[in-house]
């Protein structure tokens, strides 16, 4: 005999709780979702502040600033015993050449090779010792210094601030020591005076 009674439907346990006040449903068993904040934490870089005591001198402040500049430069940074860094600039090849040239110029003022080349222009002296070239170099230097000083004295007498050609020629014409330069540094003459001198020379020769 078949029973006409319908099986009782099992009521599903509702895990939904109705909030009467708001009318919204919330799951009691479900975990509440936490809203993550989209705020980005911005870290502000604080400016560097140097604390200087009243007893510190200005020299220590300058050394600290130099130490910071040395770190930014391309030089080598070395640390002292007190922890301060000091920049040591590296020497380039150009600076080394200038230093070597300065050491050589302290002894002589004219290139030795050029003096040797001038001395070798005469075939009578094919071999020249280094000390002879050095002495000729120093003698040339002393001669030019003495000649320039006397030309300067001549410009002072002429009330001029610069040395002109006439001052050099006056030194050559007035001093017998420079007579060998008479053909190289002759006095400037006007055309009329030069013509009279030439005619006088021709009459004396005739």
UniProtKB/Swiss-Prot annotation:
Coiled-coil stretches noted in the UniProt entry, renumbered to this chain: none
Protein name: DNA polymerase II subunit B3-1
Biased segments, Low complexity type: 50-59
Subcellular location: Nucleus
Positions with biased composition (Basic residues): 1-11, 23-37
Name of encoding gene: DPB3-1
Molecular-function annotations in GO: DNA-binding transcription factor activity; protein heterodimerization activity; transcription cis-regulatory region binding
Protein source organism: Arabidopsis thaliana
Tissue expr: Expressed in seedlings, petioles, cotyledons, hypocotyls and root tips.
Protein's UniProt keywords contain Phosphoprotein: no
């Amino acid at each position: 005999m078949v029973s006409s009674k319908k099986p009782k439907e099992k009521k599903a346990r509702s895990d939904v709780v109705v909030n009467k006040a708001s009318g919204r449903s919330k799951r009691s068993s479900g975990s509440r979702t936490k809203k993550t904040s989209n705020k980005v934490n911005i870290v502000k870089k604080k400016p560097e502040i140097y604390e200087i005591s009243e007893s510190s001198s200005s020299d220590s402040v300058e050394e600290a600033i130099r130490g910071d500049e040395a770190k930014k430069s391309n030089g080598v940074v070395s640390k002292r015993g007190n922890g301060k860094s000091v920049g040591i600039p590296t020497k380039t090849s150009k600076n080394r050449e200038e230093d070597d040239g300065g050491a050589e110029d302290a002894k002589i003022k004219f290139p030795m090779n050029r003096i040797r080349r001038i001395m070798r222009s005469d075939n009578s002296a094919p071999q020249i010792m280094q000390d002879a070239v050095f002495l000729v170099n120093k003698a040339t230097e002393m001669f030019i210094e003495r000649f320039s000083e006397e030309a300067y004295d001549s410009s002072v007498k002429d009330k001029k601030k610069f040395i002109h050609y006439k001052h050099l020629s006056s030194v050559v014409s007035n001093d017998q020591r420079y007579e060998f330069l008479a053909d190289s540094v002759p006095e400037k003459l006007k055309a009329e005076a030069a013509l009279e001198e030439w005619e006088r020379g021709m009459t004396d020769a005739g």
